[in-house]
Amino acid sequence: MNIAITGLGIICAIGNDCQQVLDSLVNKKTGVGMMKYLQSCHKELPVGEVKLSDDELKTLLGLPVGSLYSRTTLLGAVAVKQAMADAGLSADMLVGKKVVLISGTTVGGMDVTERILVEMRDTLQTPNTQQQSPVDYVKRHDCGSTTNEIAQICGLDCEVCTISTACSSAINSIIVGCEMLRSGEADIVIAGGSEALSKFHLNGFNTLHILDTEVCRPFDATRVGLNLGEGAGFVVLQKEDVNAKAYIGGYGNKCDAFHQTASSDDGEGAYLAMREALESSGIDKSQIDYINAHGTGTPNNDPSESVALKRIFGNDIPLVSSTKGFTGHTTSASGSIETVICVLAMQNKFVPVCYGFSHIDEACIHPFEGDDKQHRMDYVICNSFGFGGNDSSLLLMKHDRSLPPPSPVEREPECDNKSPFKGDLEGLGEFIVADITIDSMEQLADYKEYISPKEGRRMGKLMKAATLTSLMALREAGIECPDAIITATANGMLETSEKFLVDMVDNGEETLSPTLFMQSTHNTIGSAIAIRTKCHGYNITYTQGKDSMKWALRDAERLIRMGKAKTVLVGCHDESSPLFQSFYDYLNLSVPQIYSRSVVLKAK
């Protein structure tokens, strides 16, 4: 079954809608420049900002200017509304249908939290009168809340899901959306991602010394780093092909299982993701017309991706470019923003140039530099590779294509009009072969059988607990390396993130720790377990508040019942942290200090 893309929505540094973005690409106009809205001291760093203030975005959405929303929410709502309108859908038309909104983000509400953190802390010194106070924003800080708010602003009364796999989040949202359509869990999926620039974000990447002080130059011999960007991209996915803009023919989600921030020299994760996208589509590699590369412009990513491309295509590599010289690296939103860009290129038969490229690097592929020709754009691959080696690829097709019958291991379950996957452990009893929980600090004391003292000293309590329950569950199940790793977390590495945030707010932006930032992404746990177990299989992280585990279990059951995995490690991991615990206490919210549960599912 090929999934139809029936609506497109985009807002980024080169335009506030599809037409503006198309014009900028055709006219080779970059959106990367001096920061205007982000209030950072690092003015030397160019960024790909959306050319609208928060107040202008609120006005565009019909929201009160005085209302408090994260920029992630606002950008996402703009793109979702565009995609719905492009598909000819209104909220009223969706009543009675199984609709799902899936968004990818990592920043979530951080742009607001960092701005009002001092005010939030000061409020702790005053009595809680049960009226709205700055502390209340802690309930909206998380990634899942931004997706809830996007749905609310767009009038969507539907299932809501958030995925956070760093820079591959948005493509993974699209992949999950396709799987839900194939399984009968949804009639219509609106999938993509949204990410706002924040000081936390900017300074984190800056501590890694991978930001360029000029416009980035992917695959260029003189490249030194990336430019951060922001924006949102969403697509409407349907099984019907009415007014289809393009089709999704295949996709791959694999893990490099190499390092938390660096890509392997042989590009294993990228290679496996592209190979799976090709195999699942039935398209021969010789038919690919264009590849939108992840191409960040960093010294590490570009040669690694180039090796992966050469492993797939040999000496016959299709036209390749990275569009991050136009938009900046929009991190969690990059996959969906670039998916929309790919569809625009397919519709208009042009290949976006690799902006900024001028010097050949023998260690990299030679990207497309531009011409005046129209190009066949029938089959296109879009790559997104994230921290932790969460690598995903999407294969887009201009026309519908009848595929050969699926093999027995790829058969789809027979479904009625109800969701076949409930996301609860009770319904999965037949598959559960191990179930381990840690919910107290005392249980972390005896970890040395699984974690060395040296490792333990470097780990925070959540990483220690997650590693312990995961390895104990795998041992109990008699499995060294699972086929897939699925993680659920409401707040991710909260203690690590809090330390970085507080240090930045209290001591400025100049002396921050790269180690803290490297361990702040929500997919840190899932990727660390993959690295430890050498698992190159499917790897994803759900972050939808209290429903995170439900989404993770639904995905795991789907993989098993559809024959895509025989063994799946599912983990639910969350923690509290000193300052955030003070906020929770102030609001009389009950949050455990530590909670880690790992379950192994095995097909019969």
Question: What function would you assign to each model-found segment?
Answer:
Residues 1-158, 179, 198, 206-227, ...:
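Conserved "HGTGT" condensation-loop signature of ketosynthase/thiolase-family condensing enzymes
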Residues 202:
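A short local structural element in Rossmann-fold oxidoreductases
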Residues 173:
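Active-site histidine-anchored catalytic micro-motif
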Residues 178-197:
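Short glycine/serine-rich loop segments
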Residues 159-165, 187-193, 568-573:
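A short, small-residue-rich loop immediately preceding and capping a beta-strand
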Residues 170:
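Short conserved active-site loop signatures built around small residues
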